[in-house]
Amino acid sequence: MQNKRDSYTREDLLASSQGELWPQGPQLPAPNMLMMDRITKMSETEGDFGKGLILAELDITPDLWFFDCHFPGDPVMPGCLGLDAMWQLVGFFLGWVGGKGKGRALGVGEVKFTGQILPTAKKVTYEIHMKRVVNRKLVMGLADGRVCVDGKEIYVAKDLKVGLFQDTSSF
């Protein structure tokens, strides 16, 4: 597959948001909703289940858009953005393995938040362990994920589900 590498820069991720990385595959969202600065590792055979591993990072600076509005005087990154980042990465993996279609989050089995991301943090790390990839008429990924801030685990998600669809008009 063209553009299949084991790591991606921010410029690559921005190209994905414009449909330029794999034109028939899923796109990442554009900023401000793009929730990572780089993907540092992609593997089809590693991870907790031997079905794929994705490692990605987001650099934290106090001027990130969400700190101004969530919450004024008590800034914290919304937990849903970390969850969305994990779905973004599962969708990216589906495109990386050749899946075609538009990516949509389909659900999550369980999410636990045990910490927070403050403007004083330096780096968020995302870790996605693929459990299953279905690449037939239905294209779907199932994964577990973790979000860490400055090395400390703060979110855990089980059974993240993302599907790829040729037509989303009736979704």
UniProtKB/Swiss-Prot annotation:
Enzyme Commission designation: 4.2.1.59, 5.3.3.14
Pathway as given in its UniProt record: Lipid metabolism; fatty acid biosynthesis
Domain of life from the UniProt record: Bacteria
CDD domains documented for this protein: FabA
GO MF term (any one): (3R)-hydroxyacyl-[acyl-carrier-protein] dehydratase activity
Annotated SUPFAM superfamilies: Thioesterase/thiol ester dehydrase-isomerase
Active site: 70
Stored Pfam families: FabA
An individual GO BP term: unsaturated fatty acid biosynthetic process
Record's subcellular location: Cytoplasm
Function: Necessary for the introduction of cis unsaturation into fatty acids. Catalyzes the dehydration of (3R)-3-hydroxydecanoyl-ACP to E-(2)-decenoyl-ACP and then its isomerization to Z-(3)-decenoyl-ACP. Can catalyze the dehydratase reaction for beta-hydroxyacyl-ACPs with saturated chain lengths up to 16:0, being most active on intermediate chain length.
Complexes and interactors: Homodimer.
Family label: Belongs to the thioester dehydratase family. FabA subfamily.
Name of the protein in its database record: 3-hydroxydecanoyl-[acyl-carrier-protein] dehydratase
Organism expressing this protein natively: Vibrio campbellii (strain ATCC BAA-1116)
Source lineage: Bacteria, Pseudomonadati, Pseudomonadota, Gammaproteobacteria, Vibrionales
